[in-house]
């Protein structure tokens, strides 16, 4: 039986910008996407640590090395520039193949502080 499990997470990223009039999505620095094993147009759950809001959206790539985290569309009304967010991607796994999520921990400058492979 397959189960939906946490695949990867970018923990405590800082929102650098938001655009209500853009068609939707979360823009993420391509370097972070590569390190986290996330892909453009992948479905993600985003949790705002500052206000508790959660929303589902999809990823669009931002320039590699830009350190940008940009919330677009209607979800931009749920966050403020400078808020810290947790970005979570999920996958479907057989219980015997799941090894745990990859976790990217960020600092306040959107620099990677630690990369962990959590075990189950």
From Swiss-Prot:
Species this protein is from: Thermosipho africanus (strain TCF52B)
GO CC annotations on file: cytosol
Subcellular location, record wording: Cytoplasm
Cofactor dependence: pyruvate
A Pfam cross-reference name: Asp_decarbox
Pathway this chain belongs to: Cofactor biosynthesis; (R)-pantothenate biosynthesis; beta-alanine from L-aspartate: step 1/1
Name this polypeptide is given: Aspartate 1-decarboxylase
GO annotation (BP), single: alanine biosynthetic process
């Amino acid at each position: 039986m397959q189960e939906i499990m946490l695949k990867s997470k970018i923990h405590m990223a800082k929102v650098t910008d938001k655009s209500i009039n853009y068609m939707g999505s979360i823009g993420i620095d391509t370097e972070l996407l590569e390190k986290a094993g996330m892909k453009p147009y992948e479905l993600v759950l985003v949790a705002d640590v500052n206000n508790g809001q959660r929303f589902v959206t999809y990823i669009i790539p931002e320039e590699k090395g830009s350190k940008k985290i940009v919330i677009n569309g209607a979800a931009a009304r749920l966050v403020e520039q400078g808020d810290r967010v947790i970005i979570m991607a999920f996958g479907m796994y057989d219980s015997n193949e799941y090894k745990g999520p990859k976790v990217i921990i960020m600092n306040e400058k959107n620099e990677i502080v630690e990369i962990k492979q959590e075990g189950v």
